[in-house]
């Protein structure tokens, strides 16, 4: 029997500042958080202020497309 899929969906939050800086950063790569959101309550893309270890500061993390 298949698992019940509810309104919760897994989303990836990507550091917006890392993607804007491009190649001029100390560490290569972009930091991502994995979280869940409720599709029924929050239909707009998720934006949270989280800590980025590559930027070494709190930055805005935006939901990215899969």
Swiss-Prot record:
Keyword line: Chloroplast, Plastid, Ribonucleoprotein, Ribosomal protein
GO MF annotations, alphabetized: structural constituent of ribosome
A single GO BP: translation
Any one annotated GO CC term: chloroplast
UniProt superkingdom: Eukaryota
One Pfam family cited in the UniProt record for this chain: Ribosomal_L33
InterPro entries: Ribosomal_bL33, Ribosomal_bL33_CS, Ribosomal_bL33_sf, Ribosomal_zn-bd
Subcellular location: Plastid, Chloroplast
Transmembrane segments annotated in the record for this chain: none
PANTHER family registered for this protein in UniProt: 50S RIBOSOMAL PROTEIN L33, CHLOROPLASTIC, LARGE RIBOSOMAL SUBUNIT PROTEIN BL33C
Family: Belongs to the bacterial ribosomal protein bL33 family.
Protein name, entry field: Large ribosomal subunit protein bL33c
